[in-house]
């Protein structure tokens, strides 16, 4: 039984080849404070896989990187319903990478607003 707002392991992008393909062939965009990459492929079993990244170059302390990734995951988890509906409707696999690209430690509300905007853009471009 699936929980309505879950982020299971199957929805995380963990394959090294898939990550390389996403960064090599994916379309990119920028919504402050994120640079994002999206790769859409046709599929018989539509799914979404997501990657969250906070570069060590910008945030030296691991606890700050972990805090930012936790905020990113939570914002995605609570706002991914429209994306999942569009994926099922169009029958595509979508890989998304969110790369936090500022040195500021932003509040959850700012991060959530940006992720909502990115998910809306990805959903529109189906």
What residue spans do the PLM features occupy?
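Positively charged, solvent-exposed patches that mediate nucleic-acid binding
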Residues: 1-126
């Amino acid at each position: 039984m699936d929980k309505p707002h879950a982020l299971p392991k199957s929805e995380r992008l963990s394959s090294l080849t898939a990550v390389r393909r996403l960064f090599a062939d994916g379309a990119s965009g920028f919504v402050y404070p994120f640079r994002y990459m999206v790769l859409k492929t046709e599929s018989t079993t539509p799914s979404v896989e997501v990657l969250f990244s906070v570069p060590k170059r910008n945030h030296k302390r691991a606890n700050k990187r972990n805090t930012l990734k936790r905020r990113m995951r939570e914002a995605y988890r609570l706002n991914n319903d429209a994306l999942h509906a569009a994926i099922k409707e169009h029958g595509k696999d979508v890989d998304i990478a969110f790369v936090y690209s500022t040195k500021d430690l932003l509040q959850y509300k700012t991060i959530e607003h940006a992720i909502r905007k990115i998910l809306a853009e990805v959903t529109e471009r189906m």
